[in-house]
Amino acid sequence: MKETKNAEIRVPAEPYEFTFDPTRVALLCIDFQRDFVEAGGFGESLGNDVSTLRGAIAPTRKVLDCFREQDWMVIHTREGHREDLSDLFPSKRDRGNPTLRIGDIGPMGRLLTRGSKGHDIIPELYPIEGEVVLDKPGKGAFYGTDLETILRAGGITHLILTGVTTEVCVQSTAREANDRGFDCLILSDCTGSYFPEFYESALHMFKAQGGIVGWVGTSTDLLTAVDAAIPEIGESK
């Protein structure tokens, strides 16, 4: 980890500046899976236009590269279920398109099922050795996982959130994190929704009432703030 000029990195954000100690921050890449982001996956089976999510990939890659260069903690999540579906509630499987459900065969294998091609993370953001990959059975990344244990063990207090979709898995994770005392910065250009109105509403909810759930910023402002605190990043680009 490169030495910073100051103890804190200060990022312009809403409702006000987000500050973090670089030794206590982690990046969450939430559910950038083929099943949600690529054609032929679970998201498309529900009638969604998956192209609406792809705009979040490139800016997320820039943030991911920054965290990798600094050797800061990176955690990837994948929503999905065991092959025998023993961790899938009937109420969840029964929702959505009645002709194609979780566990059924799609173009990329069984939908939202661990071990299938669709369940895996997209190549553009694929984890490298040493990065945590959490398989979660629900929408929030804390439910049914050891995410909190990993964060506490690493001394993490602040989270940078990216991923899909804004109003479902990202929002659920942010709320769970907030209740556990973690400060969250959601990067608006590193997340996306199938529904533009849901995307906008979710971001407003995050930052409402003085940041009731967390802060909202952009990848550009985050990377600029890191560059200012750690000049070596900028010099190496």
Predicted regions and their residues:
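Short glycine-enriched, charge-decorated loop/helix-capping segments at active-site entrances
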Residues: F42-T52
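Conserved hydrophobic packing residues within short motifs/helices of P-loop NTPase cores
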Residues: A26-L28, I75
